[in-house]
């Protein structure tokens, strides 16, 4: 399976980079992983609703340019469905069974995802109703994808 993580912005924090590197290494035994970082838009603290939409639209265009036609797209969105680790594993197994071996997970910037990205998504996934920094979500996502592969193969994992 080929997993792409398409995310807005560069990772700056060393502790997150170390965690992401660790899970990327672990995932190499299960899939081909690609992390694609698209540039984020400069966004001042105070913005109008129209300015926020413009930032999301520009970031969204960059995201959409990275999505391949045949990829199954799972967008991380606060209004998405909340899945257990077992459900994520089952969904990934189902995709593989149906020949959908290219999966893209999309993580938006600090303002979230543009409507055009949400419309392109085949599924919307939420980790929580809480808001998390998008850089931290990248680490949590990689851990959950790793856990999903372990569950699928009947290998031990922490519950």
From Swiss-Prot:
Catalyzed chemical reaction(s): pseudouridine(1915) in 23S rRNA + S-adenosyl-L-methionine = N(3)-methylpseudouridine(1915) in 23S rRNA + S-adenosyl-L-homocysteine + H(+)
Q: What does UniProt give as GO cellular component?
A: cytoplasm
Keyword match Iron:
no
Q: What is its EC number?
A: 2.1.1.177
Q: What class of enzyme is it?
A: transferase
Q: Does the keyword Cytoplasm apply?
A: yes
Q: Which UniProt keywords apply?
A: Cytoplasm, Methyltransferase, rRNA processing, S-adenosyl-L-methionine, Transferase
Q: Which SUPFAM superfamilies match?
A: alpha/beta knot
Sites where the protein binds S-adenosyl-L-methionine: 76, 108, 127-132
Query: Out of the domains of life, which is the source?
Result: Bacteria
Localization: Cytoplasm
Recorded GO terms, molecular function?
rRNA (pseudouridine-N3-)-methyltransferase activity
Give the main location: cytoplasm
Please name the InterPro entries in this protein's record: Alpha/beta_knot_MTases, RlmH-like, tRNA_m1G_MTases_N
Q: What does this protein do?
A: Specifically methylates the pseudouridine at position 1915 (m3Psi1915) in 23S rRNA.
Entries under NCBIfam families matching the protein: PRK00103.1-3, PRK00103.1-4, tRNA_RlmH_YbeA
Query: What binding partners and quaternary form does the record give?
Result: Homodimer.
* Family affiliation: Belongs to the RNA methyltransferase RlmH family.
Q: What HAMAP family does the record tag this protein with?
A: 23SrRNA_methyltr_H
Put simply, this protein is called Ribosomal RNA large subunit methyltransferase H
Q: Which organism is it from?
A: Brevibacillus brevis (strain 47 / JCM 6285 / NBRC 100599)
Q: Which taxonomic lineage does the organism of this UniProt entry have?
A: Bacteria, Bacillati, Bacillota, Bacilli, Bacillales
The gene that this protein is the product of is rlmH
